[in-house]
Amino acid sequence: MTTVRQRIDTQHRDAIHDAQLNIYGSRLATCGSDRLVKIFEVRPNGQSYPMAELVGHSGPVWKVSWAHPKYGGLLASASYDKKVIIWNEQQGRWQKAYEWAAHEASTTCVAFAPHQYGLMLASASADGDIGILRYDNSSNEWISSKIQKCHEQGVNSVCWAPGSADPAAKKRLVSAGNDKNVKIWAFDDATNEWILEKTLAGHTDFVREAAWCPVTNNGQHTIVSCGMEGNLVLFRTSNIETEEWKAKLLETAPCALYHSSFSPCGSFLSVAGDDNVITIWRENLQGQWIKVPRDNKEREGMSQAVGAPGAQR
């Protein structure tokens, strides 16, 4: 049974669009239509304390992303004002470290890459482009580039493939857009360009988010996407270099689905939709994704449906 561990009064003055914990679960970043980014300390005893209120955007802030802690306290935010802002914590104080305003429409998403890729982040925009920012240690500057015309009518989300200890492994990311497609992009070291590697079909309406599982299992990669038609689609490949991606429809919800996100260990998936409900999915030993019941009554119903006593797993 899933339970609410704690509630945090963020005191945002308008709708909250995103909330992200850092890798340790000790800090929470939130953002909203009030144009603010807020940071809270989250303690193991369930208590939370406000740490900072970051002011810098001139429009609603849609998304926040934490960098790996090896790079210090870095947080990125994406806003309707077309900007990506990177915030840096130094001696307990947060300040704007870098601002990038190269998109021509709302910046819908931002995501730091796994630390194996180096200090990098990707941004998605309603202008149809994906932005890439990479920190160059030799010049101590952020180097920017774009993957242009990725999705017609706009890009809604970007998510990086898990990092690899193999230095020869390709950098990859997945994007979701209003063209009803999920696309995988790979970086070509020879040409120094991002190449469209695969287009994945499974939606009949805008794809709101695509999440790449942060953990591989014996070389198996997993992506989950959700869309406005209510489809929750699982894509898998047993070998990303040689095998095709296979699609499986996990569910068609009775409402639009907006968000999908894996747990850090990759064994749980959360999905949020227009019905104000968050559903949790988990992968069983057979590699199948099943819903986690929200309460005991639902658990009993699921157990009866599969013909097993409620006490068994």
UniProtKB/Swiss-Prot annotation:
The keyword Repeat applies. One of its GO terms (cellular component) is endoplasmic reticulum membrane. Belongs to the WD repeat SEC13 family. The lineage of its organism: Eukaryota, Metazoa, Ecdysozoa, Nematoda, Chromadorea. SMART domains: WD40 (SM00320). Residues 294-313 are annotated as: Disordered. The keyword tRNA-binding does not apply. Disruption phenotype: RNAi-mediated knockdown results in embryonic lethality. Causes severe defects in mitosis. Cytokinesis is blocked and nucleus formation is impaired after the first embryonic mitosis. Centrosome assembly during prophase and prometaphase and their subsequent resolution are impaired which results from impaired nuclear import of hcp-4. Impaired sister chromatin segregation. Disulfide bonds: none annotated. WD repeats lie at residues 11-50, 56-97, 102-143, 150-195, 202-245, 252-291. SUPFAM superfamilies: WD40 repeat-like. Functions as a component of the nuclear pore complex (NPC) and the COPII coat. Required for the nuclear import of hcp-4 during mitotic prophase, this step is essential for centrosome assembly and resolution. As a component of the GATOR complex may function in the amino acid-sensing branch of the TORC1 signaling pathway. One of its GO terms (molecular function) is structural molecule activity. Component of a heterotertrameric COPII coat complex composed of npp-20 and sec-31. Probably part of the GATOR complex. GO terms for biological process: cell division; COPII-coated vesicle budding; embryo development ending in birth or egg hatching; mitotic chromosome centromere condensation; mRNA transport; nuclear transport; nucleus organization; positive regulation of division septum assembly. This is Protein SEC13 homolog.
